[in-house]
Amino acid sequence: MGQKTHPYGFRLGITKDWKSHWYAERSDYSSLLHEDWAIRNYLKKNYYQAGISLIEIERKAANRVDITIHTARPGMLIGRGGSEIENIRKNLIKLTNKNVFVNVQEVKNPELDAQLVAENIAMQIEKRINYKRAMKQAINRALRAGAKGIKVMCSGRLNGAEIARSEWFREGRIPLQTLTADIDYGFAEAFTISGVIGVKVWIYKGDVPELHKEAIQELPEKAVPKKIEDEDLYEKDEVNYDVDA
């Protein structure tokens, strides 16, 4: 059975960047890793309705944490006069015992963000909307927004079935094995009466232009046949080709 590797981890360092930027000695690594998890868990759990797509964490000093939150609804995080963002900062300072600086960035096209699309489908399933309808609506919105391909898969006890199964819909291209392809991936869970339903979304936005040009330049030249005189064709049965190694 063929299994699909994680599209994000597969492209780390090529088209995708790390979600955390810091270096630590071996003795401190595990504690900082748990701290990153606690920060992300606090934000996703308490501000799930804000449509948080990505949380970037950067540590430039031992006692400083810079957090960038990418969200579709920045107003819910900032609050009136910046009151809510200040409340978030104070809670994160208590959580980490470090100086915390929070920056909020708006996601311009939520329909093209795989994580937000997956969470939106999961929320609709929790509200007892038919999963097929939710999946097809998400696909249509993404294609109208400019996606070149999208695949959505739901797994679990769909419609309360006794046996769990997986169903998926796909439109356009999803070149998972092409490293220069800009593929966004998102995963969310819908908690229903029947059990947990997993939602996975792949969105293909096109190739990364710079990497695509480099890949074309690195390709070997095509085999070019030798120029053969007419009289040579009668003397030789085979035609030789020079192929650049």
Swiss-Prot record:
Q: Which InterPro entries match?
A: KH_dom (IPR004087), KH_dom-like_a/b (IPR015946), KH_dom_type_2 (IPR004044), KH_sf_prok-type (IPR009019), Ribosomal_S3_C_sf (IPR036419), Ribosomal_uS3_bac-typ (IPR005704), Ribosomal_uS3_C (IPR001351), Ribosomal_uS3_CS (IPR018280)
Signal sequence annotation: none
Listed under GO cellular component are:
cytosolic small ribosomal subunit
Every KH type-2 domain range: 39-108
Question: Listed GO molecular functions?
Answer: mRNA binding; rRNA binding; structural constituent of ribosome
Keywords for this protein: Ribonucleoprotein, Ribosomal protein, RNA-binding, rRNA-binding
One GO-annotated biological process of the protein: translation
What protein family is recorded? Belongs to the universal ribosomal protein uS3 family.
Alphabetical list of HAMAP family matching this protein: Ribosomal_uS3_B
Q: Subunit composition?
A: Part of the 30S ribosomal subunit. Forms a tight complex with proteins S10 and S14.
Function recorded in the entry? Binds the lower part of the 30S subunit head. Binds mRNA in the 70S ribosome, positioning it for translation.
User: How is this protein named in the record?
Assistant: Small ribosomal subunit protein uS3
Q: Which gene encodes it?
A: rpsC
